[in-house]
Curated annotation (Swiss-Prot):
Residues 74-103 are annotated as: Disordered. InterPro entries: HBV_HBSAG. Systematic vaccination of individuals at risk of exposure to the virus has been the main method of controlling the morbidity and mortality associated with hepatitis B. The first hepatitis B vaccine was manufactured by the purification and inactivation of HBsAg obtained from the plasma of chronic hepatitis B virus carriers. The vaccine is now produced by recombinant DNA techniques and expression of the S isoform in yeast cells. The pre-S region do not seem to induce strong enough antigenic response. Residues 109-163 are annotated as: Pre-S2. Glycans are attached at N309. Pfam families: vMSA. Belongs to the orthohepadnavirus major surface antigen family. The large envelope protein exists in two topological conformations, one which is termed 'external' or Le-HBsAg and the other 'internal' or Li-HBsAg. In its external conformation the protein attaches the virus to cell receptors and thereby initiating infection. This interaction determines the species specificity and liver tropism. This attachment induces virion internalization predominantly through caveolin-mediated endocytosis. The large envelope protein also assures fusion between virion membrane and endosomal membrane. The middle envelope protein plays an important role in the budding of the virion. It is involved in the induction of budding in a nucleocapsid independent way. In this process the majority of envelope proteins bud to form subviral lipoprotein particles of 22 nm of diameter that do not contain a nucleocapsid. It comes from Hepatitis B virus genotype B/C subtype adw (isolate Okinawa/pODW282/1998) (HBV-B). This is Large envelope protein. The large envelope protein is synthesized with the pre-S region at the cytosolic side of the endoplasmic reticulum and, hence will be within the virion after budding. Therefore the pre-S region is not N-glycosylated. Later a post-translational translocation of N-terminal pre-S and TM1 domains occur in about 50% of proteins at the virion surface. These molecules change their topology by an unknown mechanism, resulting in exposure of pre-S region at virion surface. The gene is S. Residues 85-95 have a biased composition (Polar residues).
């Protein structure tokens, strides 16, 4: 098959075949299959630069002849020597003067002895200079000085290296707060159901609570009144009970917040001035004296009658709103003033008060715990508000 001239091979890409332009052999153009200058098979895949441009030269020679350029062979031409220099000076020229350090490295000018000693107080940098257990009078290694100075300069000029310990501690706090908040949220969501169970248990003292909305004709199985399905007639009553419970919880939170703000002195309510009216038609009260220090709350309230002098009463720094409510209730209900001596006497008997409290806790403790246990998740929230507000 190697001498079969009937097999066309236009560009010579098949191994062991060359293109015969006349499709016959003669003395000037021998059979190309017998050409001793042809390439072997591994060389046929080589990409050359020649007659057809980069990578387009046929591997066995182009159609333009057997010249080196046609076959993609490059001839190295020696470069012409440079012309003789006309400069009379020969040899190495002197090195030019370097620009000042303050122009090339301005950050290095900030590194003076004061900054060096301040940085030396850092425990991390101090460990590079003095060995463990050594003193400041020890020998300082030059290599450590160089590294410390360069690292300190780079720390001033380059980007700071992030401290993974600070990043981890910074992320740990929000994650713990998120976990605690989610835990409290799940517990708070159980408060309405627990209070609903306690509410319905009051109707079944000593027995198992059973929904009263089901009857013999309904297809609803026996269930608790706190878990009524939507098709049960008692479902609407369960929703009403839980809505009332939510309102009570919201009211409890608002009362606690009001008490906390009043205790902190953030409710500067003007007390009732003796002899003044409690209605809106009474004398106009205006706070004229600012509070002591930098507080924005006033310290006293004044009223000025049309035919008299100005009367000012100081505002309590704490429990101002509570005292205002007590004064208002004492004006409306005169019998409350009779309880003041009794309360003062009872508070003055501290041993008796403590014994009474201990006895009440011992006697009513278990039942009070069953009643107050649903409100336990609210205690951490109240505690955080009390501490941080």
């Amino acid at each position: 098959m190697g001498t079969n001239l009937s097999v066309p091979n236009p560009l010579g890409f098949f191994p062991d075949h060359q293109l015969d332009p006349a499709f016959k052999a003669n003395s000037e153009n021998p059979d190309w299959d017998l050409n001793p200058n042809k390439d072997n098979w591994p060389d046929a895949n080589k990409v050359g630069v020649g007659a057809f441009g980069p990578g387009f030269t046929p591997p066995h020679g182009g159609l333009l002849g057997w010249s080196p350029q046609a076959q993609g062979l490059l001839t190295t031409v020696p470069a012409a020597p440079p012309p003789a220099s006309t400069n009379r000076q020969s040899g190495r020229q002197p090195t030019p003067l370097s620009p000042p350090l303050r122009d090339t490295h301005p950050q290095a000018m900030q590194w003076n002895s004061t900054t060096f000693h301040q940085t030396l107080q850092d425990p991390g940098v101090r460990a590079l200079y003095f060995p463990a257990g050594g003193s400041s009078s020890g020998t300082v290694s030059p290599a450590q000085n160089t590294v410390s100075a360069i690292s300190s300069i780079l720390s001033k000029t380059g980007d700071p290296v992030p401290n993974m310990e600070n990043i981890a501690s910074g992320l740990l706090g929000p994650l713990l707060v998120l976990q605690a908040g989610f835990f409290l949220l799940t517990k708070i969501l159980t408060i309405p159901q627990s209070l609903d169970s306690w509410w319905t248990s009051l109707n079944f003292l000593g027995g198992t609570p059973v929904c009263l909305g089901q009857n013999s004709q309904s297809q609803i199985s026996s269930h608790s009144p706190t878990c009524c399905p939507p098709i049960c007639p008692g479902y609407r009553w369960m929703c009403l009970r839980r809505f009332i419970i939510f309102l009570c919880i919201l009211l409890l939170c608002l009362i606690f917040l009001l008490v906390l703000l009043d205790y902190q002195g953030m409710l500067p309510v003007c007390p009732l001035i003796p002899g003044s009216s409690t209605t809106s038609t009474g004398p106009c009260k205006t706070c004229t004296t600012p509070a002591q220090g930098t507080s924005m709350f006033p310290s006293c309230c004044c009223t000025k009658p049309t035919d008299g002098n100005c009367t000012c009463i100081p505002i309590p720094s704490s429990w101002a709103f509570a005292k205002y409510l007590w004064e208002w209730a004492s004006v409306r209900f005169s019998w409350l003033s009779l309880l003041v001596p009794f309360v003062q006497w009872f508070v003055g008997l501290s041993p008796t008060v403590w014994l009474s409290v201990i006895w009440m806790i011992w006697f009513w403790g278990p039942s009070l715990y069953n009643i107050l246990s649903p409100f336990m998740p609210l205690l951490p929230i109240f505690f955080c508000l009390w501490v941080y507000i």
